[in-house]
Amino acid sequence: LMMLLPLAASAQGGGESVSKHFNMFVKHHTKILIDAAESMPADKYGYKPTAAQWTFGKIIAHMAGDNRITCSAIAGVAPDKSPEPSATASKEELVSALKGSLTFCEQAVAKVNDGMLAGSVTYYGQRATRVSPLIGLVEDWSDHYSQLAGYLRLNNVLPPTAKNGEM
């Protein structure tokens, strides 16, 4: 919710564009998500705090797959039909898949301007405004970064946003 406040403020005529704030969010989260994925030791990609939770690798695999769907909607193109990476793939394969999906998202969001936000796109098989997958992206990345940061801490690894007072 805190991530959406600048968006609401700019929509009230603050002078800055809403799409600029989405771009800032995507650039920042691309960096911290990649840093988080790279920070976890390869032998801990199978780690999960409880039996009911996903492994660290599953979260990375899920994000790589889900980003293709969400960012295809943002771009207004059909999603890539390739399957989500395996949760048991190597760290290198998972980080590579995540990086590729994040690059695709950066490119998709960079093409969006404020005039496009109310435009119609297909998002998970439904018609929606383009702002719907953008908000979904903010929500999803914030949720999963929080998971990754918790998993890192449980393995004595400092999360990227805890280093140098970064937020």
Report each predicted region and the residues it spans.
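Short, contiguous alpha-helical
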Residues: 23-34, 44-83, 122-167
